[in-house]
């Protein structure tokens, strides 16, 4: 209903239904989408955002909660993942993600990737606060897939050591993830040994690793990702969880 009302208002005001994404020329002469750019001369994007907020505000937490609620017939996922989102708003983990995400520390997340845009066509036009919501959704399925939102075993033995916490980071080896390079990050940003033990530090480290993945691979869904829900070749095909939750976000349409 909210989307219908937004479309109706846009039509009445004579605004374009879809904002034109600015095109850029690469050095090889090909044309592409500037994922992190906005055309400041085109006010229609800001007008559409304002209309969306006026109609109903940010209801994205409801989209994430709906995904969790419908994940299993017994509705247990919505209950165990309440630290991320509830039917009334963001839980402490969701709020933590919204609070720590910023364009300086995680520039590649805010720029996005082509496969993220394919799942969320509106991503290039979203404002910073809306982009943060997309990563609450992504982190939601990541902690669901790795630890059932903390309800599963705290540790697990693996070939590379003991995985620990809600994102199953390698205990005592979290800082070694830096070996792939900081990609311009400052010295205070990244993962530290022990981050996997607590949810808040796990989430920050996880976002940092995802930012590094975006920079190195240019993909949300990557065969070399640390997490199964982001690996398209995974035996259980959990990457489909990520595709589903992102594509069903109202702000992405």
Residue ranges and their predicted role:
Residues 29-30, 36-40:
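Disulfide-bonded cysteine-rich modules in secreted/extracellular proteins
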Residues 15-19:
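Sec/Tat signal peptide C-region and signal peptidase I cleavage site
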Residues 4-13:
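Sec-dependent N-terminal signal peptides
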Residues 5, 35-36:
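Short, hydrophobic/glycine-enriched beta-strand segments
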Residues 13-14, 49:
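N-terminal regions of proteins, emphasizing targeting and processing segments when present
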Residues 20-26:
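Cleaved targeting-peptide boundary
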Residues 42, 49-253:
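Catalytic glycan-binding domains that act on GlcNAc-containing polysaccharides
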């Amino acid at each position: 209903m909210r989307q219908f009302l937004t479309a109706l208002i846009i039509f009445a005001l004579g605004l374009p239904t879809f904002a034109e994404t600015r095109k850029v020329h690469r050095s090889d002469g090909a044309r592409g989408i500037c994922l992190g750019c906005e055309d400041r001369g085109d006010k229609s994007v800001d007008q559409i955002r304002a209309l969306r907020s006026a109609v109903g505000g940010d209801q994205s937490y409801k989209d994430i909660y709906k995904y969790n609620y419908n994940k299993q017939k017994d509705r247990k996922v919505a209950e165990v993942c309440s630290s991320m989102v509830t039917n009334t708003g963001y839980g402490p983990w969701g709020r933590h993600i919204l609070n720590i995400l910023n364009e300086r520390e995680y520039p590649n997340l805010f720029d996005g990737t082509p496969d993220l845009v394919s799942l969320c066509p509106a991503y290039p036009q979203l404002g910073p606060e809306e982009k943060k919501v997309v990563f609450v959704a992504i982190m939601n399925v990541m902690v669901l897939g790795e630890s059932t939102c903390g309800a599963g075993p705290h540790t697990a033995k693996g070939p590379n050591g003991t995985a620990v916490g809600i994102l199953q980071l390698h205990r005592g080896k979290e800082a070694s993830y830096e070996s792939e390079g900081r990609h311009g990050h400052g010295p205070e940003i990244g993962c530290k040994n022990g981050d996997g033990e607590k949810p808040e530090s796990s989430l920050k480290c996880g976002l940092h690793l995802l930012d590094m993945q975006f920079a190195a691979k240019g993909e949300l869904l990557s065969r070399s990702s640390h997490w199964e829900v982001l690996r398209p070749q995974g035996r259980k095909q959990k990457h489909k969880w990520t595709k589903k939750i992102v594509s069903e976000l109202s702000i992405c349409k």
